[in-house]
Amino acid sequence: MAIYETMVRLTRGNETLLHPFVDSKGSFGKQYSTMAFAASRYTEVKLDKFCAEIFSGIDKNAVDFVDNYDSTMREPTILPTTFPNILVSPNSGVAVGIACEIASFNLAEICDGTIAALRNPEITSEELSELIKAPDFASGASILYNKEDILSIYETGRGSVNMRSRYVYDKESNCIDVLEIPFGVTIEQIIAKITDLIKRGELKEVTDVRDEIDLHGFKLTLDLRRGTDPEKVMAKLFKKTPLESSYACNFNVIVDNEARQLGVREMLLEWIKFRMSCYRRELIFERDKKSEKLHLLVGLGTILLDLDKAIKIVRETARDKDVIPNLMAGFKIDEIQAEYIAEIKLRNFNREYIIERIKEIESLKKEIAE
């Protein structure tokens, strides 16, 4: 059940992430509501195309693998994501004595910032703030920009981001429609607070508050008394309800098995080091694969120089198990090469096949040299 609950937050339907990892069908609740999600038997999921970037290179030894909890299979110690996902998806958690609250940022801005840090590792947090303007949350809402707070987050990993709900005034119906709320706040919390203010007589301008969430998205409606100024009502609500709230950033991460608090700039630099390591390992993996292939083809090339001799050796061998040793002895090739050659069908030894293999040998030599 815990795994399913975790997956719910990763789905497109839950709307917690700017870029969901899981494409979903069914009811997965909403991050801005306490509405329960459906049981697993009523939902369908599959990895989103976005995940191709999360797992890129995982089959090329880009990261280390270890045994899972019961040693029945191997699992990666970390995923070789091709972009700084830790800054694109919000992260929240508590370990022993360590709390973590990492805000999400716009993917395009993070990519621009990463490229800038790659070109200039000495880039300052202020220069970075020109490219990465501020955190960006899936719930929407306006960021109340404060340069000092933003620079603190970028430099130290600590600070707060103030968010304010977005709304429109429907003059015809004389009501306020709240369309976006701060990240981490639920519609139930807001309604409960507004209802309490109405009961205590502190919000006489509002006659009713309704949850109008539907398939089209989030909507919280406030009916107003005639002659009420909607701007003044919202100013009061921003002050007394979660329609305006803050997100406290605390960027604690694990680097080389050690807990560290990093700012955005340091995170990008650490991710660049990690990604360069992944890319280097992928190149080594591909080079080794090409070297193995070249080794087999070099053995095949030796056979192709005297194909009649190879056929004679096979034909004159009495037992199947002696074919490999006899080819090894006859052409001075190793067992791996002999096994590879023995598996090739006779029909493949035509002129076209031979020319293609010779070209492939030359191509592999060039690629490995590069």
Regions found by a protein language model. Give the residues of each.
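Long, structured ligand/cofactor-binding scaffold of large enzymes
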Residues: 1-56
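Conserved alpha/beta core surface patches that mediate binding of polyanionic ligands
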Residues: 2-14, 70-82, 155-160, 196, ...
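Short beta-strand elements
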Residues: 12-17, 51, 84-87, 161-169
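Short coil/turn connectors at secondary-structure junctions
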Residues: 16, 59-60, 83, 90-91, ...
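A short alpha-helix capping/helix-loop junction motif
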Residues: 21-28, 62-64, 249-250
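P-loop NTPase nucleotide-binding/switch module
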Residues: 30-33, 54-81
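C-terminal interaction appendages of subunits in large macromolecular complexes
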Residues: 45, 49, 91-94, 98-370
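Long insertion/accessory domains within large nucleic-acid-processing enzymes
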Residues: 71-88, 93-96, 100-101
